[in-house]
């Protein structure tokens, strides 16, 4: 009986180092894969909330909240109040801008300077603002200017006196920048009807 016991002991005998290795293998199981996170763009979140898709809002260029009132959307642009300030009595005629009475000058020479316009328009009143629109590519004037007066009488006097006059070898046109009623077109040439080069057909 003792011999059998010794044989059994010899059969199950093992190295202590192998026992340590087995313990380490049992203590370090294969780590479980991390849970997949939902994209924040899709409306979910890494925190596990993200189930309320009905309240999800899409932000970015080209998107807007249609449920918001139209006035609130326009308020951010800062332009609605400006147009509300444009006064008018409802009839045809010039309209005052927010700051004053603005005169439009067309036919301006491409090399004209602000001083060239200021010197002739200041004779009719205080010029509050003068703007020359330049071409970014060439740096020359695009051909028109905006001049602002404080009073209606000053702007009207400048229009009557300077419309059709010469500035730097070019004839300028001076008129109201804002007005009610039909738009008055200037310097528009009427084209003659085209004539056919083919000989007229003979009628039988």
Curated annotation (Swiss-Prot):
Subcellular localization, as worded in the UniProt entry: Nucleus; Cytoplasm
GO BP field: mRNA processing; mRNA transport; nuclear-transcribed mRNA catabolic process, nonsense-mediated decay; positive regulation of gene expression; regulation of translation; RNA splicing
Biased composition regions of type Gly residues, renumbered to the chain: 42-52
GO MF, one example: mRNA binding
Pfam families given in the database record: RRM_1 (PF00076)
Residue stretches of biased makeup (Basic and acidic residues): 62-73
Gene Ontology, cellular component aspect: cytoplasm; exon-exon junction complex
Assembly with partners or alone: Heterodimer with MAGO1. Heterodimer with MAGO2. Part of the mRNA splicing-dependent exon junction complex (EJC); the core complex contains MLN51/CASC3, EIF4A3, MAGO and Y14.
PANTHER family cross-referenced by the UniProt entry: RNA-BINDING PROTEIN 8A
Function in brief: Core component of the splicing-dependent multiprotein exon junction complex (EJC) deposited at splice junctions on mRNAs. The EJC is a dynamic structure consisting of core proteins and several peripheral nuclear and cytoplasmic associated factors that join the complex only transiently either during EJC assembly or during subsequent mRNA metabolism.
UniProt name for this protein: RNA-binding protein Y14A
Organism of origin: Oryza sativa subsp. japonica (Rice)
């Amino acid at each position: 009986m003792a011999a059998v016991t010794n044989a059994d002991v010899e059969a199950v005998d093992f190295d202590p180092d192998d026992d340590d290795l087995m313990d380490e293998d049992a203590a370090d199981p294969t780590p479980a894969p991390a849970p997949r996170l939902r994209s924040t763009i899709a409306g979910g979140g890494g925190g596990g909330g993200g189930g309320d898709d009905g309240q999800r809002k899409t932000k970015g260029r080209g998107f807007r909240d249609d449920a918001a009132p139209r006035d609130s959307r326009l308020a951010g642009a800062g332009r609605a109040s400006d147009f509300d300030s444009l006064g008018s009595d409802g009839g045809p005629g010039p309209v005052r801008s927010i700051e004053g009475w603005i005169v439009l000058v067309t036919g301006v020479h491409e090399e004209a300077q602000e001083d060239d316009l200021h010197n002739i328009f200041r004779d009719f009143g205080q010029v509050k603002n003068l703007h020359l629109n330049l071409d970014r590519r060439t740096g020359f004037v695009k051909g028109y200017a905006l001049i602002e007066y404080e009073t209606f009488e000053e702007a009207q006097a400048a229009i009557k006196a300077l419309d059709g006059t010469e500035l730097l070898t070019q004839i300028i046109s001076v008129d109201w920048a804002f007005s009610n009623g039909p738009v008055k077109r200037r310097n528009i040439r009427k084209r003659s009807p085209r004539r056919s080069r083919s000989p007229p057909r003979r009628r039988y």
